[in-house]
Amino acid sequence: MDKIWRELGLTDEEYEKIISILGREPNITEIGMYSVMWSEHCAYKNSKPLLKYLPTKGERVIQGPGENAGVLDIGDNLAVVMKIESHNHPSAIEPYQGAATGVGGIIRDIFTMGARPIALLDSLRFGIPDDKRTKYLIENVVAGIADYGNCIGIPTVGGDTYFEESYKGNPLVNAMCVGIVEKDKIKKGIAKGIGNPVMIVGATTGRDGIGGASFASQELSEESEEKRPSVQVGDPFMEKLLLEACLELFETDAVVAIQDMGAAGLTSSSCEMASRGGVGMELDLDKVPLREKGMTPYEIMLSESQERMLVVVEKGKEEDVQKVFKKWGLNAATIGKITDDGMIRVIKEGKIVAEVPAKSLAEDAPQYIREEEVPKWQEDVNKLNINEVKPPEDMNKALKDVISSLNIASKEWIYSQYDYMVRTDTAITPGMDAAVVRIKGTKKAIALTTDCNGRYCYLDPYIGSQIAVAEAARNLCMVGAKPIGVTDCLNFGNPEKKEIYWQLKNSIFGIAKACETLQIPVVSGNVSLYNENEEGAIYPTPVIGMAGLIEDVSKICTMDFKKERDVIIILGENKGEIGGSEYLKVCFGMVKGQPPQIDLEEEKRLQELVLKLIDKGLINSSHDISEGGFAAALVESAISGKKGAKISLQTSLREDIELFSESPPRALITVSPEKVEEVLKIAYEYQVPAQKVGVVEGKKIAIEVNGKKIIDLPLEVLEESWRGRIKWEMERN
């Protein structure tokens, strides 16, 4: 056992701490249990001291961070349950199963709370698809998500995808799930009732995924390929049965507490439930249904076999549970009981093979406040002399290049593989500002989005993270939804490196600032660190998943142009910023400058204005202006509405900057001619600049700036560039 704890990811100091907790040397099973529970993946030991700065309270918050998922009150005795999680490391090694089990795990987090899952979203980051390995990762991640979601029958309605060099070999796969539950039927993972039986339900336990949580807490290296057994294998049909069986079980009064077995399997579900309830748990491993012979206590406690749950049952109700699971063709075995001594006691063949305090596993992991410093390259990348960037001679070509860039081009190649209409409640489908899902039996709907521009966060993690929150909220407002809650997935490199810790800290402070100002609480989330390989770290990528409430689904708005002669209006001010922009990268190969500055009070006014205009039925389309600036937003609205636009801009800015600056907060709206004056009047009341810039007409995009015609392109030419790019990249050799 020479220094085995080091191989499992524990430091010598952490090992000494375990000895002092137990008053003795731990055995191999106990070391394994601590190694997964004290891993970054389970314990958040590098991020917990920072996460406390996030605002988590609000009038709608029923359950904030600390449970399997966050819960928000949406009225009518209903609540929305939401959570996002990463499956980055497994997806880098075994992309199909890594992505599929990421989806499976997040779905379980939702129905564990008693909710029926109604929607999935995926936030994906890949390298540039110009080599075989990257294409292999993209194809298989997308297929894994599609197959799992499609088979289980939950629509994948939205998400976001970016391609940047920093994600090469280090893809990010963040899966978000949302469910609906009646408020009085919410379930929690708090074990109680001394003597109550503990049951394992669902699939059998095998050797897949052993040590997966520890694996997810390391940098990727050449050896990572050998860790394929650390990637779990998912079975969506089994999960569908488990989902229905659990929801049926919740209609009985048999369940005291329930938790899914995700990272760290039986170890985490037992110690977290026991710790929350201040009780202990005795587990007899001879009673666990196994799929492989000769499994050791270490393997059984650390297995991450999918589609399993741990349930604390009211004493005497075991048969009720078995009856439900038998009906669905699933296992339900009593493997232990609740005790009063706070210990997790593991028994095999009549002998105690592990005995540790539940609280020490779940709550006593050391927390680290790391040293930080501004990266040495930061000052250099933030310098941008605009005079070095010569305006392009051919603005038509510049526009085509920007809208066909990988980050702006249509993501149809990806989302067309997903079934986004299953359950028939999807009111706004992928490709718009936000997805919208109707809530059966009500007039309400939930709008959903995920957002984060990692390039902005690389240039300034504090500002970039504020923009991520602001853009997510703005996207929801564009469809007529009031933002109500955030679930965040913080993807960063190795926090033991001072410059990465600096990024993490500033990013969290940025999210906190934006959420406080916009009054949107963070109710759940996930942290994924050590996202780096031999090439270096990923861009800091704090993905913001956000939900918004629409009281009346008949009032939703979309970004597509609706009617010829509608007047096109820009809300908000263009401050002429091109640092970190798509234009700068695509047309000049530069990732430099400061990201656009954001005034959150201005953002708040713009969002409230758009919600007001949509509620009063004054606008026909609305689209946020972000990557690619006004020009990209205009083309997107035109393509999706199959109608052109004639634009005339007056500006003191350079032509290219006027078109491609990404200054927030801005929006592009269209208004019937007879309603224009009223819209401008209300915008003035909200102190939001509003400028008439043109009309919807014809089948081309024509733009003049200060009286000079600079863009004149048929819509079909633009559409071909925009729609075909990703498919073309994936199919060329």
From Swiss-Prot:
User: According to its record, what are the GO cellular component terms?
Assistant: cytoplasm
**Which Pfam families does this entry report, sorted A to Z?**
AIRS, AIRS_C, FGAR-AT_linker
Q: Which residues bind Mg(2+) 2?
A: 109, 260
Q: Which GO terms describe its biological process?
A: 'de novo' IMP biosynthetic process
| Keyword list, A-Z | ATP-binding, Cytoplasm, Ligase, Magnesium, Metal-binding, Nucleotide-binding, Purine biosynthesis
The residues that the entry says bind substrate are: 86-89, 108, 232, 304-306, 528
Disordered, as annotated region: 212-232
Give GO MF terms, alphabetically: ATP binding; magnesium ion binding; phosphoribosylformylglycinamidine synthase activity
Residue sites binding Mg(2+) 1 per the record: 85, 526
> Enzyme class, one word?
ligase
Q: What is its main location?
A: cytoplasm
Keyword Transferase tagged: no
Q: Which domain of life is it from?
A: Bacteria
- InterPro entries in the cross-refs: PRibForGlyAmidine_synth_PurL (IPR010074), PurL_linker (IPR041609), PurM-like_C_dom (IPR010918), PurM-like_C_sf (IPR036676), PurM-like_N (IPR016188), PurM-like_N_sf (IPR036921)
Its pathway is:
Purine metabolism; IMP biosynthesis via de novo pathway; 5-amino-1-(5-phospho-D-ribosyl)imidazole from N(2)-formyl-N(1)-(5-phospho-D-ribosyl)glycinamide: step 1/2
Keyword Cell inner membrane listed: no
Record: active site: 41, 87
Q: What does this protein do?
A: Part of the phosphoribosylformylglycinamidine synthase complex involved in the purines biosynthetic pathway. Catalyzes the ATP-dependent conversion of formylglycinamide ribonucleotide (FGAR) and glutamine to yield formylglycinamidine ribonucleotide (FGAM) and glutamate. The FGAM synthase complex is composed of three subunits. PurQ produces an ammonia molecule by converting glutamine to glutamate. PurL transfers the ammonia molecule to FGAR to form FGAM in an ATP-dependent manner.
Q: Subunit info?
A: Monomer. Part of the FGAM synthase complex composed of 1 PurL, 1 PurQ and 2 PurS subunits.
Name the family.
Belongs to the FGAMS family.
Listed name of the protein: Phosphoribosylformylglycinamidine synthase subunit PurL
